[in-house]
Amino acid sequence: LELYKEVKNTFPNLDDFKQQFTQAYSRYLVLFPNDKIPTIVTSVPGLDTQWPSVFLYENDLNIYLDMYLGADNKIYKQSGIPLYISERMDKKFLLVDCFKKAIVYKQLPEKTLVTLLDRVIYEGKKLYFTQTMLPNEPLENIIGYNEEKFQWAEQNYGKVWAYIVENNLLYSKEENVIRQFAEEAPFTNPFGNNSPGRMGQYIGWKIVSAYMQNNSEVTLEEMMKNTDSQNILNNSKFKPTK
């Protein structure tokens, strides 16, 4: 009952959100005209953080509103959800998540992600796609960092990349290596507590952005469908300074 109350307080109505979504989706339809706008379906399943907070099923865009109550919400604290997860459980991330966690899969081909590079490029595509659909959204919201973490990533991604390359981790198939750089974590090992997690995703976004900048003849759709991670890396000419 308390959860429903919190949802009602946070989302007295969804008019603004629906308007923003429709606007962003019309941008999507210009690039992918064979698609149709999904129906928004909201529910409150009861804080299941193991399940995506937004997902597509047929033509329904399902949104779990109890996953967007704000990082400081007492229910999240009582439920023991760690801060690095709850930081993104805020309604300012809802529109981003609709594209990053759901709509993007309409354009991402199924691919077995074998190496860290595969995963990095895959995650980078999701972020680049979302940024293209939401050009007015602050970049830190698209990446899912607060301002401090975003600044750290911006200043240090060259160091993280150098570490990955110098330690021969780029083509690693080890699950723990892929997890270390590409999945949810309070920080990125071995860069200390000030670093954000998911630095591999951030680097992937940088590589894909460089690829699109250096290959202006490539369309968004072509890039999304290109499953050759090495090809994207090579043609990105990505060479950050340490």
Predicted regions and their residues:
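Acidic/His-rich structured neighborhood in mature extracellular/periplasmic domains
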Residues: L1-F150
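A cross-kingdom marker for long, charged
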Residues: L117, I121, K126-K242
